[in-house]
Regions:
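Hydrophobic pocket/interface hotspot
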Residues: 16-17, 26, 44-46, 62, ...
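Short, flexible helix/strand-to-coil boundary loops that buttress conserved ligand/catalytic motifs
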Residues: 20, 30, 75, 137, ...
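A conserved amphipathic terminal alpha-helix motif
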Residues: 113-147
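A solvent-exposed, acidic/Ser-Thr-rich amphipathic alpha-helical stretch
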Residues: 32-47, 52-53
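Generic structural detector for well-ordered beta-strands
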Residues: 6-10, 47, 61, 97
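Alpha-helical scaffold segments that form or flank carboxylate-/histidine-based iron centers
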Residues: 11-12, 49, 124-128
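Hydrophobic ligand-binding cavity/cleft-lining segments
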Residues: 1-35, 39
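Hydrophobic-ligand binding "helix-grip"
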Residues: 35-37, 55-103, 112
């Protein structure tokens, strides 16, 4: 009940960390507009700008920021209703783990907690997010290669 994606990036851990945790960079590759910096224990808000998903809010609670090692947040299972109170909805945990490797960084993204979602929504949420993380791994790789 977890999604795990790994990618070898040809940049140092410090550069990947910056792309993940500086919200001004995160929005470029993730394709979202976020209202302010990531702060542990605080809610990060905004909206998705990825084509076809612009109607979705960006809402996450930052869980951990272990310098150049781990960045994690929980995000709620979104309703298609743009006015829904998503922050009180069941959520999953997203973890970005960074590991130095020869020639760059191994980035591992894990999303877990799908068992917390309503039974009727689990399979679709898992499939949608599995495909989404495949796309996001390509996005961050392209972003870092070009900048």
């Amino acid at each position: 009940n977890r999604i795990v994606k790994r990618i070898e990036l040809k940049v140092p851990v410090s550069r990947v960390w910056q792309a993940l945790t500086d919200y001004r960079e995160f929005v470029e590759w993730f394709r979202a507009k976020i209202d302010g910096p990531f702060v542990v224990g605080e809610v990060s808000t905004g909206h998705i700008t990825y084509p076809g998903y612009e109607h979705l809010k960006w809402e996450a609670v930052v869980q951990k920021m272990e310098h150049e090692r781990l960045f994690s947040f929980t995000w709620p299972h979104h309703s298609d209703d743009p006015n829904a109170d998503n922050l009180n909805a069941p959520s999953t945990l997203v973890e970005f783990r960074l590991e130095p490797i020869k020639g760059g960084t191994l980035l591992t993204v894990t999303e877990s907690g799908f068992e917390n979602l309503p039974v009727d929504d689990r399979d679709k949420a898992f499939r949608d997010n599995e495909g989404g993380w495949t796309e996001q791994m390509t996005n961050i790789e392209t972003y870092l290669a070009n900048g």
